[in-house]
Curated annotation (Swiss-Prot):
GO terms for molecular function: Hsp70 protein binding. The lineage of its organism: Eukaryota, Fungi, Dikarya, Ascomycota, Taphrinomycotina. Residues 43-112 form the J domain. This is Uncharacterized J domain-containing protein C4G9.19. Keywords: Chaperone.
Amino acid sequence: MSKIFFRLNLVRNSLWRRAASFTSYSELKSLTPYEILELPRTCTANDIKRKYIELVKKHHPDKMKNASQLAPTESPPEINKHNEEYFRLLLAANALLSDKRRREEYDRFGIHWNQPSHPTHPSPQNWSQARYPTYSRSRRSAGMGSWEEYYYNSYDYMNDQNASNKNRKFDDEGMLVFAGILSILVIINIYSNYRNGKFYREARSAAIGRAEDNFDYYSTGMADLSKDDRISRFLILREQSKQIPTQQKPSSLPPPERALPAPTMPTPSS
């Protein structure tokens, strides 16, 4: 238990020293986002993220709440007020410097950081309260003063939500593109099957026509011939079809002359 009190005293003393260094709101709000995060202007995105997590854990209002409950008479009321304001500015500074475009605009033109040191811009209270709700004592007393609340009220949650929405939009667009490509492939397949079927029907019709022509070619005049004559004529036409190219084959032949009956010889009378 003594170790716990010792650590809480260290936390309370560090918070008191931090608050004592800013004797008024004007001095606290005159700091730049780099000064809030205790980083140089040449810091990288990883430096900002690392320092932000470190300072959030160090200056979270829940720590001050626990220290005030254990030793309320030793904690001046200005500490809570100053640390809440500092924590709010910490969230705003991280939101600004984590955005590459806004950070470049701030470095060049001094915009996006609406502090009293820039009188041409609106007051910081209206700007910050719309994006970063202050940590109210009533919410803390109701058990709502957790790190999750600050996360959902901070710019980190907004960035995560925006990234999630962008990913969801990208997934939806990807599904639409995939569905479009699949539809095109199905249409191409159906059209290809239609063309193949049409070609097959035309080839089949042409083959049937050629078969009918060949049948007419071989069967013309067969009805008027005897069985032996039909066999002889078929053999002759088959031999001729082997010698004559198909494209030069006549479509029909004139009917053969009807064979005359052999003359009968008179029988001698006895």
